[in-house]
Amino acid sequence: MARCCKCPRLHLAVTVLACVLVFTEGVNLNDLLDRASQLSDKMHSLSTSLTNDLDSHFSSVGGKLMRPSMCHTSSLQIPNDKDQALSVPEGELLSLVRSLLMAWSDPLALLSSEATSLPHPERNSINTKTRELQDHTNSLGAGLERLGRKMGSSPESLSSLPFNSNDLGQDNISRLVNFHFLLSCFRRDSHKIDSFLKVLRCDAAKMLPEMC
C-alpha cells in the first residue's frame, strides 16, 4: 500500500479510492462489492451534481430533448427494477454492469474534452467535475474487472455498445444541447449501475430481498 501514498495529489479523493481497488486481489467478495458500491454511489452523485450545474443555465432546452430511447446504451437488455435485478444470476448481472460502464468510456472522453470550452457560465466547475467523473468511472471499471475474476464472470459475456460520435456540434446551442443530453443518459445509466451493484452486494451478504 505504501506505493499508493506516492501517487500524484491531483484528484486526491479519486486517487485514494483507486489505490484501494488496485490492491484487492486478496480481499473477500463482500468487501470488494462494498468498495465498488461506494465508487458507484459517488459516480452517480457527481453526475447528478453536473446535471444540476447545466440546468442552472440551460434546463428549458436540455430537458425537452431527453429521450431515454435515444441514448446509445438503450439497446442493452437490462432489468427494469430491483425485483427483476434480484432474479438475474450474479455473474450475468455483473456482466451487465460492466457492459454498461464500458459503453461510457468514449462518451465520457468526449464530454471531458468538450467541457474545457463549453459555452456555459459554470464551465470551470463542469470541467472539473467531468474529469473527476471520468476518473471515478476508470477506477470503478478496474474494480469491476477484479470482481469479474472473483465471481468467475467471463469477458466473452460482455456486450459491446459502440458510440459513433466524435463531436457535440459546431454551434454553441448544439454543443450545450448534446452535452446535456449525453450527460443525462450517463446519469440514468449510473443510477442503474449503482442499483445493480447494491443488489449484488445484498446477494453476497445473504440479505433478505426486502432489505436490499
From Swiss-Prot:
Keywords: Disulfide bond, Hormone, Secreted, Signal
Gene3D superfamilies tied to this protein: 1.20.1250.10
Predominant localisation class: secreted
Matches recorded under InterPro entries: 4_helix_cytokine-like_core (IPR009079), Somatotropin/Prolactin (IPR001400), Somatotropin_CS (IPR018116)
BP terms from Gene Ontology: positive regulation of cell population proliferation; positive regulation of receptor signaling pathway via JAK-STAT; response to nutrient levels
Tissues in which the protein is found: Pituitary gland.
Cellular localization per UniProt: Secreted
Gene Ontology CC: one annotated term: extracellular space
Source organism: Ictalurus punctatus (Channel catfish)
Gene coding for it: prl
One protein family per Pfam: Hormone_1
Entry GO MF terms: hormone activity
Source organism, top-level taxon: Eukaryota
Covalent S-S links between cysteines: 71-185, 202-212
Signal peptide: 1-26
Protein name, entry field: Prolactin
TM region(s), chain numbering: none
Family: Belongs to the somatotropin/prolactin family.
